Amino acid sequence: MGACFSSHTATAAADGGSGKRQQRKGDHKGKLPDGGGGEKEKEAARVEFGYERDFEGRYQVGRLLGHGQFGYTFAATDRASGDRVAVKRIDKAKMVRPVAVEDVKREVKILKELKGHENIVHFYNAFEDDSYVYIVMELCEGGELLDRILAKKNSRYSEKDAAVVVRQMLKVAAECHLHGLVHRDMKPENFLFKSTKEDSPLKATDFGLSDFIKPGKKFHDIVGSAYYVAPEVLKRRSGPESDVWSIGVITYILLCGRRPFWNKTEDGIFREVLRNKPDFRKKPWPGISSGAKDFVKKLLVKNPRARLTAAQALSHPWVREGGEASEIPVDISVLSNMRQFVKYSRFKQFALRALASTLKEEELADLKDQFDAIDVDKSGSISIEEMRHALAKDLPWRLKGPRVLEIIQAIDSNTDGLVDFEEFVAATLHIHQMAELDSERWGLRCQAAFSKFDLDGDGYITPDELRMVQHTGLKGSIEPLLEEADIDKDGRISLSEFRKLLRTASMSNLPSPRGPPNPQPL
């Protein structure tokens, strides 16, 4: 379903390596096949990970499940409990470069970070001996998502069934992003069903190309699988948004049985991804609901800043059908935007509040879900404790206690010690999505927000008008507040300058080239 390429050295998947899993029969009677090695084995013996070294005593090895570039994956049985597991064995002799060792360590760290999520393969433990590393995980026997797609009539899912599958993939992406991770290789081959039942949960199994996010950075390498790669990956400036693009490609395939971008060569596929739009005219698209088409289009927006986040996508009416608001995780971009809001000038904060007040309920569905996720006691407002709980998650930054209070105070425009929904919206708007997805509506919203300050309707905001807007509660000199937006330095703000000010408000959460983030005390 798609060639795998990478300029990033990595252990590949829970299948023992990158590429298609190969189903094999055979019992190895408790011993793993010898990979050979000679001098390489002696060299490998010097690589130490610090993992437990009693794998053979703990597990009875069974049939081979698959293999790849770096090793094999086997079924195994826990000798003490009788539980069946999957074991990924990675050959130390093939870790000839330090980066390969770091990749194994990172993959184990990632599996530990994501442990416990219902749609991510469960990690039990990591072991090693002189020759191999063993990663013990949940055994999934329902086959790949790819195989189920191919088994469907015309290789298509019904909309209802597709939404169930896509919802699970989005939950994985949202969980990764909340933990400061980007998956980087979302494709049907990397999702397994727990069992052969039709309603079996889907499990993400391959984190070999995954990497950590560091705020303010981007990935500059090209990794992933050709059919699912996002445009920004090919431009070597990618982040968590690339996972959402890949899920958009998978959704397109689930609904129509075809790839949205196809060519005979890898370079040709890349050209299609960069230049062309998916086709929604050929059958079966005319018979597919407008909601499904709207959903796919919003995931396949070429500009990553205008693309839905994974958590936003979970709030879309099509994929949410049958799902509950409580199932929607907190969006990393919402927390990042709140953190950024504190750094804005007072006038920019005022402008965002004015913009928020112009938006209609249907435009705010995803932010309402986010507000409800943080408002644990369902009081209709977010308290300091609820905000502290939301911001205490395992983020790519670390907030000290006083900073949480500072965020609350910046967002809380009426100074009642709580954050209501309108205040929350002002601090968490995805400005670039609004501006890019519907430029006409964006223009009308900016005009409406501008009019709240332009009291005499002459097309400019003056210091006197800003002073007269009572809800700002300003004292002292007003002129300094306008300086940031007053590009032509004429002492007043035009509509064009106002719109540019709003456009500078954007999410600052971007990923790093390599390695886990160093928490940044603020």
Curated annotation (Swiss-Prot):
PROSITE patterns found in the cross-reference section: EF_HAND_1, EF_HAND_2, PROTEIN_KINASE_ATP, PROTEIN_KINASE_DOM, PROTEIN_KINASE_ST
Please summarize the record's notes on activators and inhibitors of this protein. Activated by calcium. Autophosphorylation may play an important role in the regulation of the kinase activity.
Q: State any GO BP term from the record.
A: intracellular signal transduction
Which residues hold Ca(2+) 3?
454, 456, 458, 460, 465
The entry marks the following residues as binding Ca(2+) 2, namely: 412, 414, 416, 423
Q: Where is this region: Autoinhibitory domain?
A: 325-355
**S-S bonds:** none
What induces its synthesis? Answer: By the mycorrhizal fungus G.intraradices colonization in roots.
Q: Which Gene3D superfamilies match?
A: EF-hand, Phosphorylase Kinase, domain 1, Transferase(Phosphotransferase) domain 1
EC number(s) per entry: 2.7.11.1
Location, primary (coarse class): membrane
SUPFAM superfamilies linked: EF-hand (SSF47473), Protein kinase-like (PK-like) (SSF56112)
Instruction: Please list the residues that make up the active site.
Output: 185
**What keywords does the record list, in alphabetical order?**
ATP-binding, Calcium, Kinase, Lipoprotein, Membrane, Metal-binding, Myristate, Nucleotide-binding, Repeat, Serine/threonine-protein kinase, Transferase
What are the binding positions for Ca(2+) 1 in this chain?
Answer: 375, 377, 379, 381, 386
Annotated ATP binding lies at 65-73, 88
Q: Where is the composition biased (Polar residues)?
A: 1-10
EF-hand domain span:
362-397, 399-434, 441-476, 481-508
**Belongs to which family?**
Belongs to the protein kinase superfamily. Ser/Thr protein kinase family. CDPK subfamily.
Query: What's noted about domains in the record?
Result: There are 3 contiguous domains conserved in the CDPK subfamily: a kinase domain, an autoinhibitory (junction) domain and a calmodulin-like domain. The autoinhibitory domain (325-355) inactivates kinase activity under calcium-free conditions.
What protein does this entry describe? Calcium-dependent protein kinase 4
Q: Which organism is it from?
A: Oryza sativa subsp. japonica (Rice)
Q: What is the lineage of its organism?
A: Eukaryota, Viridiplantae, Streptophyta, Embryophyta, Tracheophyta
